[in-house]
Amino acid sequence: MTNKEQNSKNGHTYRATWKDYSEPTIYLLTMNTEDREPLLGELVEERIVLSAYGKVVSEEIKRIPTYKDASAIQIYRYIVMPNHIHVLLRVHKKLPHPLGYYISWFKLQCMERCSAIDGIPLEDGGNTRLNRTQKRPIFGKEYHDRILMHQGQLAHMARYIQDNPRRVAMKRARPDLFRIRQNIRFGHMSCVAMGNIFLAEYPQREVLQCSRRLTQTEIDAKREECLYQAANGVVY
């Protein structure tokens, strides 16, 4: 494996060809389970109840910095979802190997540890489809990474990870709000939209516009004004 970690599938690379993946960087990693099966748990309201496999994966994520030559890796935050995981991590100093080397080891450890589990049910007693008769990968071959390069991205991604179960629960409860609508017309304009389209017809509507020239004090004041207006029925 090269430092550029060019993993290709059907001509598409999942890695940044210009990036040395052994260098210090902050990454948001996403790994899907094999065939996107819900092996790692289930969503109960707005929380994830981990399966036996999910608990192993959660433990193994925390163990990544203890792998050989991996002490420069710091796990900031992670979330285990039923069929995928998000891991926010930082490489503090140059690694002996590209990041993909450690991800491959992580996947191998998950497979080895989970192969010893034979149909252990969910903690809450729910049904499980986790029976296996032979070793099989828990995760798919590929993983996706997002390289964080701008100020504020770390806090934003940390919130994104933390909010993942709530967003999934919302999508399941109101799938219509997350469906992309084509050719929505407002007066003489046509656009693509997603969300509660009925709000666009609400009588109390305001346009929210902010400039980069605003000071933090002005931004805070605008925020308080908008929250007050929204609480009183205004749609932005």
What are these regions (language model features)?
Residues 1-236:
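Short catalytic/metal-binding and nucleic-acid-binding patches
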